Amino acid sequence: MFKVVICDDERIIRQGLKQMIPWKEYHFTTIYTATDGVEALSLIRQHQPELVITDIRMPRKNGVDLLDDIKDLDCQVIILSSYDDFEYMKAGIQHHVLDYLLKPVDHTQLEHILDILVQRLLERPHSTNDDAAYYTAFQPLLKIDYDDYYVNQILSQIKQHYHKKVTVLDLINPIVVSESYAMRTFKEHVGITIVDYLNRYRILKSLHLLDQHYKHYEIAEKVGFSEYKMFCYHFKKYLHMSPSDYNKLSK
């Protein structure tokens, strides 16, 4: 759904951010990494990410120069720095960056920022009908925490067992709550049924597998659909295109 470019000359920082942040929970499906501003600028121009996370002090092209280069592009920026330096903070303010984080990065703080960013991204106009279908299909999945205990438990069960051939009863049995209460409460808080959420989540997970060039029937099985034709039906229902059409658009 979303793309991010992580730019830092320290490998441990790049890989740490790439591997330790649960990007898919925030619907970032593609993560690019760069070792300096020159490499980052190339990736940004080529892939047009929604988010750029960049260090300030780097060889060849520093973070401030990178901000100058991308100031007219449609992306959000988070600045990283080992230095609590007012001049860098001022540069960030001048370029309207999303936030400024000191190293070592507090992952909880970064995830809070991502939560806010995702909501902003959803509010922007969609450039194509394909974009609109994508956002409409997966918007109900963006909120990851609710005020209701049972709803959160059902979401947890879905994320743990979506790849299995499960029923609503299978999902709520471990929670010890009546089926009617669980279904009613879930619909009130989330806005869609448990089955609808499960199928949308399965289709979202299938996109990552499509990018990895699995056979479509293999993907259907991996994300929990009992039949390949049901996978195709739900894919087209939510995204208004077939898996094959999606593959063509992704190339």
Swiss-Prot record:
A biological process from GO:
phosphorelay signal transduction system
The answer to whether keyword Cytoplasm applies is yes
Q: Where in the cell is it found?
A: Cytoplasm
**DNA-binding span(s):** 169-190, 216-239
Q: Which residues form the Response regulatory domain?
A: 3-118
Cite the entry's keywords alphabetically.
Answer: Cytoplasm, DNA-binding, Phosphoprotein, Transcription, Transcription regulation, Two-component regulatory system
Sites of the modification 4-aspartylphosphate? D55
How far does the signal peptide extend, from start to end residue? none
Tell me which stretches of the chain form a coiled coil.
none
Asked if Cytoplasm is a keyword of the record, the answer is yes
Entry GO MF terms: DNA-binding transcription factor activity; sequence-specific DNA binding
All copies of domain HTH araC/xylS-type, residue ranges: 152-249
Entry PTM: Phosphorylated by SE_0166.
Which Gene3D superfamilies does this UniProt record tie to the protein? Answer: 3.40.50.2300, Homeodomain-like
Function, as annotated = Probable member of the two-component regulatory system SE_0166/SE_0165.
The identity of this protein, by name, is Uncharacterized response regulatory protein SE_0165
Q: Which organism is it from?
A: Staphylococcus epidermidis (strain ATCC 12228 / FDA PCI 1200)
Question: Which taxonomic lineage is given here?
Answer: Bacteria, Bacillati, Bacillota, Bacilli, Bacillales
